[in-house]
């Protein structure tokens, strides 16, 4: 009995067909990069202060002193959410009294921004913040928008796999690509914050579903050696490229509606890939559509300049994976023994912390010193060497040491930021870049590591639960950034501390480097780095009469 890889081995590893699929599927991820992070510019909060209407009769002196001052980073700056009571200062102005000389400003009554705000337009012409006044008492709405986008990502991650299993990888890929682009287009016509946010949730659902479908399609079409590079480098680097393109669009288009409209164009262009990307032959075979799968393989052979055998898929020889009797496993198996329970809990913590760090630093771009467009580009560009380093580390070094070192690097530089003098803001920005580099490397490696830790029978569930924890981390990340409004260093202190603690925790994971993938939960206990012993205890009073499980005792460093 031959499996799919053996049957299609005549196509070769890296011919023109494989290169075409590799680059086209990777290119389909580019819109994901800028759609996911576009909120950095769509919801940018410019400098603002209370609006003082021109209809109010104030002298120039009183108009210049109509906003109270506050101390921020050692400087006196106008308050953003308060002004002196206009009726009072208008009366003083009419009487000819001068602010500061005749009137003690500290004793004046204040009021909220009853007439709205005026916004600085040096960086943004308009954002959803300036359009719907998402500042002061409503400043929580901007991070909520981002969190709800990631809620959409979480929802999409639940349904994308089921949809692609039922309707095909290619159909779901282009359907969700259209969903992402279409709802982004509809956001342009949002009439209020609520409409924008609901549509953004749907964009998030389409974004992750598109990503998952492209990922699965590539891993099923490409050969064993190439699919590893595709999974660790291809989709990741093209995602980073999309992220790098975002500030270029935003620099030249500073109105949020026009920016959104421009960002939908690449998604529309990706629709042309329908005529070049085939359906997964593996999926077609699983559906009994062998003739269609054979047509695709023969076309691939023609592109590669190879003569295909007269019969490619012989139903009597092809190993049908669906014919094997499925074993029933449920989520309880992830906590059935002490060993797998400890690994599951630690994996959840690891994924959640990495996600908070990755998305927190990406979304924190507006709070960095310097040009927001340059900083955004650098935060995206630093991901490329991070992915390359992660791939090299996965090839040659133990997993837990590599991930722990990357996290320790990212966390330590974030903690060090609070010690940097305010005048050395370039150093602070450089430290954020290094932190993003370390956390991104860990993010890339943790996918492979988690899949290697879990046995075949529960691998999808294990990775799925961990990935869900990652989505929860991304939902929380905007509020880590939001804390920067109270203390500039607080987000970095929290993210840095969590990252370093997780780096230490990672050292207690079992090592999977160079070890065959476990197939059963019992085999999982024999992964290199775990010392085992059998708990000797009284016979359990259970109906199924199971033996006491082998548990995690210690980890050899």
From Swiss-Prot:
Gene3D superfamilies referenced in this protein's UniProt entry, alphabetically: MFS general substrate transporter like domains
Keyword Nuclease (UniProt): no
Locations listed in the record: Apical cell membrane; Basal cell membrane; Cell membrane
Keyword DNA-binding: no
UniProt-recorded Gene Ontology molecular function terms: (R)-carnitine transmembrane transporter activity; amino-acid betaine transmembrane transporter activity; ATP binding; carnitine transmembrane transporter activity; quaternary ammonium group transmembrane transporter activity; sodium ion transmembrane transporter activity; symporter activity
GO cellular component: apical plasma membrane; basal plasma membrane; basolateral plasma membrane; brush border membrane; cytosol; membrane; plasma membrane
Protein induction: Intestinal expression is induced by IFNG.
Binding positions (ATP): 218-225
Residues that carry a glycan: 57, 64, 91
Modified residues (Phosphoserine): 548
Membrane topology: Multi-pass membrane protein
Regulation: Inhibited by emetine, quinidine and verapamil. The IC(50) of emetine is 4.2 uM. Not inhibited by valproic acid. Transport of (R)-carnitine is stimulated by cholesterol in the plasma membrane.
Any Gene Ontology biological process: response to type II interferon
Summary of the tissues where the protein is detected: Widely expressed. Expressed in kidney, liver and testis. Expressed at the brush border of the small, large intestine and colon (at protein level).
Modified residues (Phosphotyrosine): 486
Extracellular compartment segments: 42-142, 194-197, 254-257, 363-373, 428-430, 484-488
Positions on the Cytoplasmic side per record topology: 1-20, 164-172, 219-232, 279-341, 395-406, 452-462, 510-557
Phosphothreonine PTM positions: 550
Catalytic activity: (R)-carnitine(out) + Na(+)(out) = (R)-carnitine(in) + Na(+)(in); glycine betaine(out) + Na(+)(out) = glycine betaine(in) + Na(+)(in); glycine betaine(out) + (R)-carnitine(in) = glycine betaine(in) + (R)-carnitine(out); O-butanoyl-(R)-carnitine(out) + Na(+)(out) = O-butanoyl-(R)-carnitine(in) + Na(+)(in)
Disease entry from the Swiss-Prot or TrEMBL record: Defects in Slc22a5 are the cause of the juvenile visceral steatosis (JVS) phenotype. JVS is an autosomal recessive animal model of systemic carnitine deficiency.
Functional summary from the UniProt entry: Sodium-ion dependent, high affinity carnitine transporter. Involved in the active cellular uptake of carnitine. Transports one sodium ion with one molecule of carnitine. Also transports organic cations such as tetraethylammonium (TEA) without the involvement of sodium. Also relative uptake activity ratio of carnitine to TEA is 11.3. May also contribute to regulate the transport of organic compounds in testis across the blood-testis-barrier.
Quaternary data: Interacts with PDZK1.
Similarity comment: family membership: Belongs to the major facilitator (TC 2.A.1) superfamily. Organic cation transporter (TC 2.A.1.19) family.
Name used for this protein in its record: Organic cation/carnitine transporter 2
Classification lineage: Eukaryota, Metazoa, Chordata, Craniata, Vertebrata
